[in-house]
Amino acid sequence: RPDTRWDDPDNEIVIASGPVGGITQYSGAGKSLVVTISPQTDSVMDSNVGGFFGPFLKFSGFDAIELQGKAANDVIVFINGVDHYVEVFEAPAEAIDSHVLAEQLTEMFANDESDRKNIGIVSTGSAADNSLIGMLNFTFYDGRRKKIRMKQAGRGGIGSVFRNKKIKAVVCKIPGVKGNLNNVVDLEAIQERGRRFNREMRELDDSQCRMRQVGTAHLMEIMDDHDLLPTHNYKYGSHKDAPRIDSAVWKSFFTQNIPDGCWIGCNMACAKAVDDYEITTGPYAGQKVIVDGPEYETAAGLGS
């Protein structure tokens, strides 16, 4: 309805990939879009995100999922793409913060260590319970680090909508990944274009975008040079101190020589991370975690 507000039960969270979602022969096919009515604007918003959940949802037979209504207590939605059923159950005991919850749920739903790569989770955290800027975290299993990592749908406060519905997590499990699980019409055409793109990445990325070195953070100096950096909430397009947050700074933090990627077969490998970052404040002080990013949007929107 036109008068639906962000915290109305009728407000939906929609998560979808696309016609070639999850295809491993073309880079970027692991992305999903998340749509809802934003608590910040009371208007429709969308956010783009990587991670395993979108492709796994597609492989389980769903083009999209719509989360509507409100639960009385915290719940987990489980999409079983192995035995083909969906289950909703209460989850009072599990953690709320994603970096802890994701590990708990992966252990809960994976059959063994080798099955951890077949679990995709959407969750948020305690910040979403206490603000209108909560984000959604989408997990992916980093086989090289043997750890669960996360990408973010960070715009519009969508995580706050998620928690307002009393959803603690949405979990999707599949039996494994193959080359054409969503049965695209013309796989040969995708493969041909994928090979072309992969060749360009191999030959040009190190001298152009450097996605495999610094991810989307390479855009910082480009946007500053072209007067497009959102400085002081778009009052200006550049700033003399922009080099303090440009890609060279982030590269010094990012772990190098690891082919990062938030989806299988994506040759951009732009999911850069800071390993063993020690938290210095709050309830997790002293713990060492993996910090993903920052992406350009975070560095520019919150840094400039």
Model-predicted segments: where are they?
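Intrinsically disordered, low-complexity segments enriched in small residues
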Residues: 1-48, 52-304
